[in-house]
Amino acid sequence: MPRDALSFELQLSAGLEATEHKLDMLTRLLRRTHVAVKHPLLASRAFHTSPALRAIDMAKVDTTERLAELRKLMKERKVDVYTYISGFTGSAGYAVVTHDKAALATDGRYFNQAEKQLDSNWELLKQGIQDVPTIQEWTADQVEGGKVVGVDPSVVTGADARKLAEKIKKKGGEYKAVDDNLVDLVWAAERPARPSEKVIVQPMEYSGKSFDEKVEDLRKELEKKKSLGFVVSMLDEVAWLFNLRGNDIPYNPVFFSYAVITPTVVTLYVDESKLPKEVKDHLGDKVAIRPYEAIFGDITALSKDAFEAADADATKKFLTSNRASWALNKALGGDDKVEEIRSPIGDAKAVKNEVELEGMRQCHIRDGAAISEYFAWLEDQLLNKKATLDEVDGADKLEAIRKKHDKFMGLSFDTISSTGPNGAVIHYKPEKGACSIIDPNAIYLCDSGAQYHDGTTDTTRTLHFTKPTDMEKKAYTLVLKGNIALERVKFPKGTTGFALDSIARQFLWAEGLDYRHGTGHGVGSFLNVHEGPIGIGTRVQYSEVSLAVGNVISDEPGYYEDGKFGIRIENMIMVKEVETNHKFGDKPYLGFEHVTLTPHCRNLVDMTLLTEDEKKFINDYHKEVFEKTSKFFENDKLTMDWLKRETAPY
């Protein structure tokens, strides 16, 4: 590693890696080695809440001493650019520090949160805002004059590495892979053991397709591509392909693993102690089991053998996902021997079969009943019993209610239980001892979801228990109109989520309002609650993948006023073929089927803003909600009365 000028770029999942133990060990290493580090927070919503995260609130973190120590050490080490701990706890961010600057980049979901948490030492780069540089541009601007930016290749994609390398090269710098991961050196022998939770089988009654069929389908894709094989690196893709589920990653039923599929061999890389007898019986002798740690050595040898064989075809390559790490690409021999593509497994996984679709329908009935029971309880506690409840109390109660329902396996993300101004923090996470008391006179936003053996849920409802302001009612109704419009749209086959995004925003736009997040994300079947490659929004990737029959996706427009309130309404919708009077271009036309079954808040609806057609749509929806969920409340008068009131016709 060159000593003249180095920045070390480290990317890890906040959900996987941000633990109290790691932060403590990082601090010890800083004192010991005079080095400071910060990882960009990339990831997804976490499955279980770590003690460290529970200790974090939304207050500013004074980083003056940290930065002073870091800059002193940077001068000693002749380091010009480094990443560092900023005090920001959002799940998507990137911090970079130079001798005289410190910047953190994040997207619109976290502008509010970052402004609350970052102290005056930091420049906030609001990604996506006009004239604000990307973090890559900002980083490249700091390395003029031959400086070196180092990266652990196992935590960046090949595409991201190439893009940043090009930017740095144009500035006269160098971007290179560094073998050692600083966090791994920090932990050393004190690093916590990798989770050893047992893997379970996702049976045919829920998966609807055998893993043999899925492997055969993948091999057909490999044949079309004339490929030597496919390295599976996304955990949810491994789980889906083999009809297995795990519990290694908070809220996501996956397990640490890789897989390699060639035309003749299927190999699963996993700690074999995690596989009980029923899993081994399920896999049989069709799948070779290799240690998780063997993946890089094995694929290096596999590639070498393939390209050095006497009958080797120089035109054939190995395939990896375009979301796979740069390290996988390098282990297979680099760009000349690897083609990075949108994963065919990801594409197949996003198209649910009839068994999976029916599972989504059924789990949302149970989940909708749980949410209604919670809202009825919460209203009674706040208005009738005058109880004092904080946001965590609410989230815990909702989880307890969900646990009573059949096939419940856990939450699908941390419940966003937010009152008043906290609702404006789009990915708000309440912490016991640092959260707010639920105010019955303020808007309450609840975004929550669960994992069931037959499906995954994600529902957001916004409530007001007393008298909302005119602006709150107007904003809520505009969001509701957008939610309905998106669900009701019909579109030709081949349409992307990028093309549909404005349908949900149109009523807000007409008033000069908007929201800084996507309108929809794909959802797994007892898998990750955020699932690609589909989505509805302005991300470039959403313009590259057409929506297809069998996709399950969220419909979640919103509106937020910093320091005041947040509004979001989220339903799960499934793509289906629909009838139209004409079929221009002889194309099938598609539409959506909702599966979420939770009432909208009557108290927040401004009836004067709804058309008669929209009122009928809501009435029909509420009738369905009552018919499908009221059976759970035959002996629960409180919830039954609440449900009857909330689903009564307008």
Curated annotation (Swiss-Prot):
The record's free-text note on cofactor binding: Binds 2 manganese ions per subunit.
Signal peptide range: none
Cofactor(s), names only, from the UniProt record: Mn(2+)
Binding positions (Mn(2+) 2): 447, 458, 570
Catalytic activity field: Release of any N-terminal amino acid, including proline, that is linked to proline, even from a dipeptide or tripeptide
PROSITE patterns the UniProt entry points to: PROLINE_PEPTIDASE
One GO cellular component term noted in the UniProt record for this chain: cytoplasm
InterPro entries membership: Creatin/AminoP/Spt16_N, Creatinase/aminopeptidase-like, Creatinase_N, Pept_M24, Pept_M24B, Peptidase_M24_C, Peptidase_M24B_aminopep-P_CS, X-Pro_aminopeptidase_P
Keyword list, A-Z: Aminopeptidase, Hydrolase, Manganese, Metal-binding, Metalloprotease, Protease
Domain of life: Eukaryota
EC number from the UniProt entry: 3.4.11.9
GO MF terms held by the record: metal ion binding; metalloaminopeptidase activity
One Pfam family recorded for the sequence: Peptidase_M24
Stored PANTHER family: XAA-PRO AMINOPEPTIDASE 1
This protein's name: Probable Xaa-Pro aminopeptidase P
